[in-house]
Amino acid sequence: MTLYIPELPINNTIFPDTSLALSDPDGLLAMGGDLSPQRIIKAYQQGIFPWFSDGQPILWWSPSQRAIIQPNLVHISSSMKKIISKNNFSLSINHAFHDVIDACAAPRGNQNETWITFDMIAAYQKLHQQGIAHSIEVWRDNKLVGGLYGVCIGSVFCGESMFSKEDNTSKIAFIALCQHFDKFKGQLIDCQILTKHLQSFGVQNESRDNFINYLNQYKNININKKCWDKQTIFIKNR
């Protein structure tokens, strides 16, 4: 069976309507274009994100189901509350973006490759320099042991990847993101694809249409820029 995948031109940042995304593979919408900040921002504003491996063209996705959570509804399990109460780590925002994305890009387990390619790292580094992409860092004894990064569109945070060098440190980073984003009236966190790891926090799937309705509601409501100042943050055991 031959699949038709629209190829994006270099000279404009228009995307096909997300309703045209394939059902198999689920959510594949287009290929090509580039990873310019303008195109990536336009993609996120429409519920689209890039995801591809080395050797593949740039692939753009908008899955039929989207994993999302309102940050004020994050669930902290009793086991995580015990870990948090020990308070043997520190948390920061945008102190080590490049180190976080490098750690997220490292192959895991039996994997020999990563979808966070050199070109993707360079693209998100540009977004970080423009104040669009941000990182949460978890430190223990001044060593980076966990974290995550993503893109903020209005009052929606689009999470891209997270990592742990010690048990539970990516979970700590996610809880910290939710609490901090909620403090600054962030409305929605887009986790893209649902996993058991995310489900434990209360992340749930919504249909693409519902997600895009939320996105359209919140993407033009900008939060206070102080949310993303370089700073130390604290996690509440609640």
Swiss-Prot record:
- EC assignment: the record states 2.3.2.6
Protein origin, superkingdom: Bacteria
Q: Which reaction does it catalyse?
A: N-terminal L-lysyl-[protein] + L-leucyl-tRNA(Leu) = N-terminal L-leucyl-L-lysyl-[protein] + tRNA(Leu) + H(+); N-terminal L-arginyl-[protein] + L-leucyl-tRNA(Leu) = N-terminal L-leucyl-L-arginyl-[protein] + tRNA(Leu) + H(+); L-phenylalanyl-tRNA(Phe) + an N-terminal L-alpha-aminoacyl-[protein] = an N-terminal L-phenylalanyl-L-alpha-aminoacyl-[protein] + tRNA(Phe)
| An example Gene Ontology molecular-function term | leucyl-tRNA--protein transferase activity
One of its GO biological process terms is: protein catabolic process
Compartments (UniProt record): Cytoplasm
Q: What function does this protein fulfil?
A: Functions in the N-end rule pathway of protein degradation where it conjugates Leu, Phe and, less efficiently, Met from aminoacyl-tRNAs to the N-termini of proteins containing an N-terminal arginine or lysine.
Q: Which family does it belong to?
A: Belongs to the L/F-transferase family.
Task: Extract the HAMAP family matched here.
Answer: Leu_Phe_trans (MF_00688)
What is the protein name for this chain? Answer: Leucyl/phenylalanyl-tRNA--protein transferase
